[in-house]
């Protein structure tokens, strides 16, 4: 992938960009094989990859510069701002949005937040696009509520320019720290969630719910988990750290009892909405801590699917899964190091199948799906 920002030394986020994608994939496979060297793997599936550019459905832009000439991108370590609106990881559909947002910031009088001086209002712009219909969610991350009415008054102009903006919000983040968002969300649109669809499964994206940034590869990840579960003829499963329900909704059948657990109430609201659309009545999504839920249950499911954050599931949950002993565990990981460590705490299971998903081209990161079978 050619990138003018990288060539000019202005951005180094894609550290592997100079390697061909095939070479990147080989290096990732080697890394994964080394991490799992202590665990014999019965079947290595071919890695899955997607487009090498224009694949992101989300932009997280630091707003800097001046109100008349805002920059949308990032801050270097020394505080120097960098405009990244030309980043080739973004689809072409983002270009007109960035182009309209710059004059809009001036029209609305949203002074970019200056980290050094601790002054200004607009900290970040977060943009998410649905693959279903090109609808978008735009979030203004503000330091305070001081400019809310000014922003509200200016929005009709922006909505006229960009009718694809289906959900528009302001998030209030008053803390002078590198925290992306605060708890208070103010909606400027009647619509509060973005409709998405992967493999004919309806999904919903709300402001505070996590959603994968590479939809092409994510849809293949969910479809693979579905195929693995269907082949096992499962009637009762848990989906822990379920997010908006991507895995559980793909795996569920009308004959199956499924419980999905996620700490975020917003994500659970999305999952419930999808389950209702699919007419699946034996799906139960609850906003709880996954480890606390699991350790408090009596009835043992045949399969437990886990999709934890980078820290992994940890020894406590591993020990409980070992004690509970479901027949199968499907582990989806964005950090193979912590996944391998967790496998060390699951001695009663063998690694049946492993597949790498190249969710983050041009970087060392990848996603991996693993099927564990009770020995």
Curated annotation (Swiss-Prot):
S-adenosyl-L-methionine binds at residues 212, 241, 262, 307. InterPro entries: 23SrRNA_MeTrfase_RlmC (IPR011825), MeTrfase_TrmA_AS (IPR030390), MeTrfase_TrmA_CS (IPR030391), SAM-dependent_MTases_sf (IPR029063), U5_MeTrfase_fam (IPR010280). It catalyses: uridine(747) in 23S rRNA + S-adenosyl-L-methionine = 5-methyluridine(747) in 23S rRNA + S-adenosyl-L-homocysteine + H(+). Pfam families: tRNA_U5-meth_tr. Belongs to the class I-like SAM-binding methyltransferase superfamily. RNA M5U methyltransferase family. RlmC subfamily. GO terms for biological process: rRNA base methylation. Keywords: 4Fe-4S, Iron, Iron-sulfur, Metal-binding, Methyltransferase, rRNA processing, S-adenosyl-L-methionine, Transferase. One of its GO terms (molecular function) is iron ion binding. This is 23S rRNA (uracil(747)-C(5))-methyltransferase RlmC. SUPFAM superfamilies: S-adenosyl-L-methionine-dependent methyltransferases. Its EC number is 2.1.1.189. [4Fe-4S] cluster binds at residues 3, 11, 14, 87. Catalyzes the formation of 5-methyl-uridine at position 747 (m5U747) in 23S rRNA. It comes from the Bacteria. PANTHER family: RNA M5U METHYLTRANSFERASE, TRNA (URACIL(54)-C(5))-METHYLTRANSFERASE. It is an enzyme of class 2 (transferase). The active site is at residue 334.
């Amino acid at each position: 992938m050619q990138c003018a920002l990288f060539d000019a030394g202005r951005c180094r986020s894609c550290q592997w960009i100079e390697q061909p994608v095939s070479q990147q994939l080989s290096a990732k496979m080697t890394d994964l094989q080394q991490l799992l060297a202590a665990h014999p793997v019965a079947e290595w599936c071919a890695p899955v990859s997607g487009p090498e550019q224009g694949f992101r459905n989300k932009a997280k832009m630091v707003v800097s510069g001046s109100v008349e000439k805002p920059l949308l991108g990032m801050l270097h370590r020394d505080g120097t701002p960098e405009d990244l609106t030309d980043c080739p990881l973004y689809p072409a559909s983002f270009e007109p949005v960035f182009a309209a947002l710059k004059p809009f910031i001036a029209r609305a009088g949203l002074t970019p937040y200056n980290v050094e001086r601790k002054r200004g209002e607009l900290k970040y712009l977060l943009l998410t696009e649905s693959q279903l219909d090109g609808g978008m969610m735009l979030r203004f991350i503000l330091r305070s509520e001081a400019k809310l009415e000014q922003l509200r008054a200016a929005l009709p102009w922006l909505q006229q320019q960009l009718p694809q903006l289906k959900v528009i919000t302001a998030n209030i983040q008053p803390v002078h720290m590198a925290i992306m968002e605060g708890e208070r969300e103010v909606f400027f649109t009647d619509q509060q969630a973005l409709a998405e669809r992967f493999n004919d499964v309806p999904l919903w994206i709300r402001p505070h719910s996590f959603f994968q940034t590479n939809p092409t590869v994510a849809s293949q990840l969910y479809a693979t988990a579905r195929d693995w579960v269907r082949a096992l003829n499962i009637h009762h499963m848990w989906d822990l750290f379920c997010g908006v329900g991507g895995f559980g909704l793909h795996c569920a059948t009308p004959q199956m009892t499924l419980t999905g657990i996620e700490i975020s109430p917003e994500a659970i609201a999305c999952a419930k909405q999808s389950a209702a659309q699919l007419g699946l009545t034996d799906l139960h999504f609850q906003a709880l801590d996954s480890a606390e839920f699991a350790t408090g249950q009596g009835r043992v499911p045949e399969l437990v699917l886990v999709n934890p954050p980078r820290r992994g599931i940890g020894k406590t949950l591993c020990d409980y899964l070992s004690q509970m002993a479901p027949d199968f565990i499907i582990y989806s990981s964005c950090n193979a190091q912590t996944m391998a460590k967790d496998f060390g705490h699951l001695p009663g299971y063998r690694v049946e199948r492993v597949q790498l998903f190249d969710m983050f081209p041009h970087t060392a990161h990848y996603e991996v799906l693993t099927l564990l079978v009770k020995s």
